[in-house]
A protein has these predicted regions:
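N-terminal catalytic or cofactor-binding beta/alpha core of small enzyme domains
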Residues: 2-170
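Active-site-adjacent mobile loop/cap segments within catalytic or ligand-binding domains
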Residues: 171-175
Length: 175
C-alpha cells in the first residue's frame, strides 16, 4: 500500500524516507519488513508522481535501543540533504501492532517506550522516554500532513484504513 500526497503549494520536489521493523516477539514475519523491503522495486515498476521521490528504505531492528543508531543515520542523512537544498524531506514509518486487523494512520508520535513483552534485545521498558534528550514521556511530535483526509481518501480507493491520533490511542482501543 502506498499513499500519495499531492502538493498544491510548497516545494516542487519532496523526498520521502521510509522505515519499518523486522520480526519481533510473537510475530515471526513482520508485514512492515516486507513493505519496506519491496518498496523500491514496487516504485521502480509503478512510478511516483513527478513531485515525489523515494529516498531511503530502511528496515530497523525491533529493539528500542538497537534501532536508534540506524534511525539517527537515516534522519541525519535527510537533514544533510535538506541543508544542501536538494529537496524537502519527509519521513514515513511503518509500525506494526500484532492485534490490529487493518492499517492505521497516526498523526503524532509519543516519546514513550512501554513494552508488554521484551524486544529482540531483551529490553522491556515501562514508561521510559525513547529518546531522553527529546524530553519526557509526555513529549509528542505531530505531522503537518492531513492524516484524517488521507485516511478517507485511501478508504475510498479500497484500503481498509482507520485514523488514530497516536499509537497509544490505538492500543487503548484494542485493550
Amino acid at each position: 500500500m502506498v499513499g500519495v500526497v499531492v502538493f498544491t503549494q510548497g516545494p516542487s520536489v519532496v523526498t520521502v524516507h521510509v522505515t519499518g521493523f523486522k520480526k519481533f516477539h510473537g510475530v515471526a514475519e513482520n508485514p512492515t519488513e516486507k513493505i519496506v523491503g519491496n518498496l523500491k522495486s514496487f516504485v521502480e515498476k509503478k512510478g511516483l508522481p513527478k513531485n515525489l521521490v523515494l529516498g531511503s528504505c530502511t528496515v530497523l531492528e525491533t529493539a528500542g535501543q538497537g534501532a536508534l543508531g540506524t534511525l539517527y543515520k537515516v534522519l541525519e542523512s535527510a537533514i544533510a540533504e535538506r541543508e544542501n537544498g536538494s529537496s524537502a524531506q519527509g519521513q514515513i514509518h511503518f509500525g506494526v501492532n500484532s492485534g490490529a486487523t487493518r492499517f492505521a494512520l497516526e498523526n503524532q508520535a509519543v516519546n514513550e517506550a512501554t513494552f508488554r513483552c521484551p524486544d529482540e534485545l531483551g529490553w522491556k521498558p515501562q514508561r521510559v522516554p525513547i529518546v531522553p534528550s527529546d524530553g519526557a514521556i509526555s513529549r509528542t511530535r505531530e505531522t503537518t500532513l492531513p492524516v484524517n483526509e488521507l485516511t478517507k481518501s485511501l478508504r475510498k480507493t479500497g484500503y481498509d484504513m482507520h485514523f488514530v491520533a497516536s499509537l497509544l490511542e490505538a492500543l487503548a482501543v484494542l485493550n
